[in-house]
Amino acid sequence: MEKYIMSLDQGTTSSRCIIFNKKGEIVSVAQKEFTQIYPKAGWVEHDPLEIWGKQAGVAGEALNIARISPEQIAGIGITNQRETTVVWNKRTGMPVYNAIVWQCRRTAGYCDELREKGIDKTIKEKTGLMLDAYFSATKIKWILDNVEGARELAEKGDLLFGNIDTWLIWNMTKGKIHVTDYTNASRTMLFNIHELKWDEELLEILDIPKSMLPEVKPSSCVYGETDEILFGVSIPISGDAGDQQAALFGQTCFNAGMAKNTYGTGCFLLMNTGEKAVDSKNGLLTTIAVGIDGKVEYALEGSIFIGGAVIQWLRDELRMVKTAQETEKYATEVEDNNGVYLVPAFVGIGAPYWDSYARGTILGLTRGAKKEHIIRAALESMAYQTHDVLKAMEEDSGIELKALKVDGGACQNNFLMQFQSDILGVEVDRPEVVETTALGAAYLAGLAVGYWKDRNEISQNWAISRSFAPAMEDEKREKLIKGWHKAVTKAMDWEDKE
């Protein structure tokens, strides 16, 4: 009986299940979108019960599409939108509030208060993260302080916290297992990445009871088995990593200096720094890349909040395109950006600027600016932001990048990939299997159950679909980048500080 690995890929806008074979090839995919909830400006929420329902649904669907039985699944890997925070009652299994999404800015003011007390330095030293509303810690505190009865339940030991991986595993095991992995824990702003444990001092500062937190384990190990009610059989849950770390693993960036960019809702650039946690001087995050083989490896990360989401905005709000794919056609219908820059700082701007008060702007408009120029500027904004992050990584790590591995939905846009290569001045490599986030989770799960022997075996699966080489003159590149930096400066510090 041929065996497969199931990967549950719980993203920001959709829940997916992808089944892989031994060669790392996709056997089947099932996907369902779920509701985005915007209660106030800058607030973003999801319904955890909807996420669980849709995730369980696509798992069954993927098995049906592949025409394989649950007995043929050797292990399940989970990868998830990171930082998004769920708090639930362990007795009833019901969330006390909606999941607060990584994009949500509601705790920006509280982060400013902590910064005034100098706590940002403590957080950076211990967790490798910037003090920001993006991470889980202040979201947990917000729920405890603002949801009626939540603090009392937490003090009694009745509330559990988890990122989406923890929430899924808890539900898959019918409440038996409350666990996360090192990569997800490293995104909470509560985990000491050097000592590899929840940090008592930070828990005290934020007034979060330790009893709420999950046990932290490696990214590749058997956490438990699915309850039989789910598939009719028990299947080992054996891999878990935050989406960006999973993509780094799926891209086989196993050596220090290897980097990838995932062009999803946000863009996320990670560079493997090996067993050394590199402290960033450029506003990048130091994070855990993977916990495997009895050790952890670290990475530098630059987070770009609005990547592919700018294309959704062009489609849904401005109605300039009917589909995301059309952006490539429009962008190539004009010779250049005609001096137009779009800074998509809809929810502030991330690395290396970190300004919660920046807002989106379109600059350089003249009477000759057309829809095509704005669409092109939107695509180019992803490449410029990637450039800024990559330059900061090179500076911090002392490693010059030779090539960039790419994945995520927008990497299928050939215009964007060519422009990315031109702006970076290095080769951009798109792999055969672009679902590297799900693939990384599958690899982690498969390694834990002996489906794959080791990383060397996995590396042999990686193949290039297309390579993009830089074709832009240095002078033109520098001029474009200078214009972009000028535009970013104009977008910063726009929103009034409360």
Curated annotation (Swiss-Prot):
<feature type="binding site">
    <location>
        <position position="308"/>
    </location>
    <ligand>
        <name>ADP</name>
    </ligand>
</feature>
<keyword id="KW-0547">Nucleotide-binding</keyword>
<feature type="binding site">
    <location>
        <position position="13"/>
    </location>
    <ligand>
        <name>ATP</name>
    </ligand>
</feature>
<dbReference type="GO" id="GO:0005524">
    <property type="term" value="F:ATP binding"/>
</dbReference>
<keyword id="KW-0808">Transferase</keyword>
<dbReference type="GO" id="GO:0006072">
    <property type="term" value="P:glycerol-3-phosphate metabolic process"/>
</dbReference>
<feature type="binding site">
    <location>
        <position position="82"/>
    </location>
    <ligand>
        <name>glycerol</name>
    </ligand>
</feature>
<feature type="binding site">
    <location>
        <position position="312"/>
    </location>
    <ligand>
        <name>ATP</name>
    </ligand>
</feature>
<dbReference type="GO" id="GO:0004370">
    <property type="term" value="F:glycerol kinase activity"/>
</dbReference>
<feature type="binding site">
    <location>
        <position position="244"/>
    </location>
    <ligand>
        <name>glycerol</name>
    </ligand>
</feature>
<dbReference type="GO" id="GO:0019563">
    <property type="term" value="P:glycerol catabolic process"/>
</dbReference>
<dbReference type="InterPro" id="IPR000577">
    <property type="entry name" value="Carb_kinase_FGGY"/>
</dbReference>
<feature type="binding site">
    <location>
        <position position="83"/>
    </location>
    <ligand>
        <name>sn-glycerol 3-phosphate</name>
    </ligand>
</feature>
<feature type="binding site">
    <location>
        <position position="265"/>
    </location>
    <ligand>
        <name>ATP</name>
    </ligand>
</feature>
<dbReference type="InterPro" id="IPR018485">
    <property type="entry name" value="FGGY_C"/>
</dbReference>
<feature type="binding site">
    <location>
        <position position="413"/>
    </location>
    <ligand>
        <name>ADP</name>
    </ligand>
</feature>
<dbReference type="InterPro" id="IPR005999">
    <property type="entry name" value="Glycerol_kin"/>
</dbReference>
<keyword id="KW-0319">Glycerol metabolism</keyword>
<dbReference type="Pfam" id="PF00370">
    <property type="entry name" value="FGGY_N"/>
</dbReference>
<feature type="binding site">
    <location>
        <position position="265"/>
    </location>
    <ligand>
        <name>ADP</name>
    </ligand>
</feature>
<dbReference type="GO" id="GO:0006071">
    <property type="term" value="P:glycerol metabolic process"/>
</dbReference>
<feature type="binding site">
    <location>
        <position position="12"/>
    </location>
    <ligand>
        <name>ADP</name>
    </ligand>
</feature>
<feature type="binding site">
    <location>
        <position position="14"/>
    </location>
    <ligand>
        <name>ATP</name>
    </ligand>
</feature>
<comment type="function">
    <text>Key enzyme in the regulation of glycerol uptake and metabolism. Catalyzes the phosphorylation of glycerol to yield sn-glycerol 3-phosphate.</text>
</comment>
<feature type="binding site">
    <location>
        <position position="12"/>
    </location>
    <ligand>
        <name>sn-glycerol 3-phosphate</name>
    </ligand>
</feature>
<feature type="binding site">
    <location>
        <position position="308"/>
    </location>
    <ligand>
        <name>ATP</name>
    </ligand>
</feature>
<feature type="binding site">
    <location>
        <position position="409"/>
    </location>
    <ligand>
        <name>ADP</name>
    </ligand>
</feature>
<dbReference type="GO" id="GO:0005829">
    <property type="term" value="C:cytosol"/>
</dbReference>
<dbReference type="InterPro" id="IPR018483">
    <property type="entry name" value="Carb_kinase_FGGY_CS"/>
</dbReference>
<feature type="binding site">
    <location>
        <position position="243"/>
    </location>
    <ligand>
        <name>glycerol</name>
    </ligand>
</feature>
<comment type="pathway">
    <text>Polyol metabolism; glycerol degradation via glycerol kinase pathway; sn-glycerol 3-phosphate from glycerol: step 1/1.</text>
</comment>
<feature type="binding site">
    <location>
        <position position="83"/>
    </location>
    <ligand>
        <name>glycerol</name>
    </ligand>
</feature>
<feature type="binding site">
    <location>
        <position position="12"/>
    </location>
    <ligand>
        <name>ATP</name>
    </ligand>
</feature>
<dbReference type="Pfam" id="PF02782">
    <property type="entry name" value="FGGY_C"/>
</dbReference>
<feature type="binding site">
    <location>
        <position position="82"/>
    </location>
    <ligand>
        <name>sn-glycerol 3-phosphate</name>
    </ligand>
</feature>
<protein>
    <recommendedName>
        <fullName>Glycerol kinase</fullName>
        <ecNumber>2.7.1.30</ecNumber>
    </recommendedName>
</protein>
<comment type="similarity">
    <text>Belongs to the FGGY kinase family.</text>
</comment>
<keyword id="KW-0067">ATP-binding</keyword>
<feature type="binding site">
    <location>
        <position position="243"/>
    </location>
    <ligand>
        <name>sn-glycerol 3-phosphate</name>
    </ligand>
</feature>
<dbReference type="InterPro" id="IPR018484">
    <property type="entry name" value="FGGY_N"/>
</dbReference>
<feature type="binding site">
    <location>
        <position position="409"/>
    </location>
    <ligand>
        <name>ATP</name>
    </ligand>
</feature>
<feature type="binding site">
    <location>
        <position position="134"/>
    </location>
    <ligand>
        <name>sn-glycerol 3-phosphate</name>
    </ligand>
</feature>
